[in-house]
UniProtKB/Swiss-Prot annotation:
This is UPF0178 protein Oant_1002. Pfam families: DUF188. It comes from Brucella anthropi (strain ATCC 49188 / DSM 6882 / CCUG 24695 / JCM 21032 / LMG 3331 / NBRC 15819 / NCTC 12168 / Alc 37). The lineage of its organism: Bacteria, Pseudomonadati, Pseudomonadota, Alphaproteobacteria, Hyphomicrobiales. Belongs to the UPF0178 family.
Amino acid sequence: MNIEPETIRILVDADACPVKAEIYRVAERHNLPVMLVANSFIAIPRDAERVERVIVSDKLDAADDWIAENSRPGAIVITADIPLASRSLEKGASVIAPNGRVHTQSTIGNTLATRNLMDSLRSAGEVTGGPAPFSPKDRSAFLSALDLAIVRLKRAGFVSG
């Protein structure tokens, strides 16, 4: 029986993703398909041949649900959403935040607990503000993490499209 290797693909939680241009460049270099998932229209550069737009309903978490349902080993999920990161990891996907943080099965529990605690503290008025502004250092860390994830998947037998 000849089993074809799985193709690496990138699934992007695209509504507020600050690194879409970087994803397009890396995907082009590695010949990888990209799926931008959003609940509204997202412009795609004309030369981004491997990028597909997936528009879901405007129902709460519809984009997250689509990404989680389509996550699998060989997929790289780009999201800042911690619950979505957890769901994608459960399906075997690699998960990277736009700031370059790599989520793993061994770290996601603490990350999810911290997120829930901070949400509770914000709701109670104990903590104000949000995350630090996105920086060039974050962009660089993201590019490094994405390249490393692709290399690891290729070494594990996944292929470029």
